[in-house]
Amino acid sequence: MERYVVVMLNKAFEQVEVAIVSGFDDAFKYGQFMMNAKEDEYRDFFLKALN
């Protein structure tokens, strides 16, 4: 199973790497969870695949 780095973007568009998660679905859900939990802190998120 591939691993992904969940990268959060804060309000200043700085990248903040938060977690390494196994599986695309779990990584995406984690990014959405962090967006909802800290919506005043994060603007967006994206995933980077690890090889």
Which residue ranges define each predicted feature?
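A structure-centric signal for secondary-structure junctions around beta-strands
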Residues: M1-R3, Q15
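A short beta-strand micro-motif
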Residues: R3-N10
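Short hydrophobic transmembrane-like helices used for membrane targeting/insertion
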Residues: V7, I20-V21, M34
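Short linear/disordered segments characteristic of secreted peptide precursors
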Residues: A12-E14, D25
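Short, mixed-charge low-complexity intrinsically disordered segments
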Residues: Q15-V16, Q32-N51
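GIY-YIG-like beta-to-alpha core
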Residues: A19-A27
